[in-house]
Amino acid sequence: MKGSDALIMALRNMAATLGVYDLMEVRVFLERSCRFVQERYRAIYVDAYMSMVVDSVLDLKAGFSGTPEMDDARYSLRDALKRLDEINAPTIVGLTVLYRTYVKGEPLHPPGTPFPGGFEVEKKDGVHYCPVKDKQSDNPEALCDICIARQSPLP
């Protein structure tokens, strides 16, 4: 079994064990993680993240059958797991991060996510760009180092 197949199988098995309590736990985790986000963005972020979590779990429970987007140049899976452990991420957050990053090849902020200054996550020519990726390098709670998005070019 290839590593990517093993990852998908592990994520499917994790998703099969998740229930309503896990969704409540992740909501609390997200609200706590976003407590310093400007108020006008906080609800947008929490709702977007919750949507990603639910979509990821439902995809995996339905038996995602796409082609994994694993890329050797990305953050190593071992390092990603270590980072998730460092921030005490609930299992469901880890599942979502790993699924979106290593299986679907999607950024952790969906395209269209707004940021102060009128900037947002964008996808151009198949590449995702984030306006704040580099600015979050000193934030121990941020998972930007795992995210596939690149820093947006300066305007």
From Swiss-Prot:
InterPro entries according to UniProt: DUF2115
A Pfam family reported for this protein in Swiss-Prot or TrEMBL: DUF2115
Domain of life of the native organism: Archaea
HAMAP family: UPF0305
Similarity remark: Belongs to the UPF0305 family.
Official protein name in the record: UPF0305 protein MTH_811
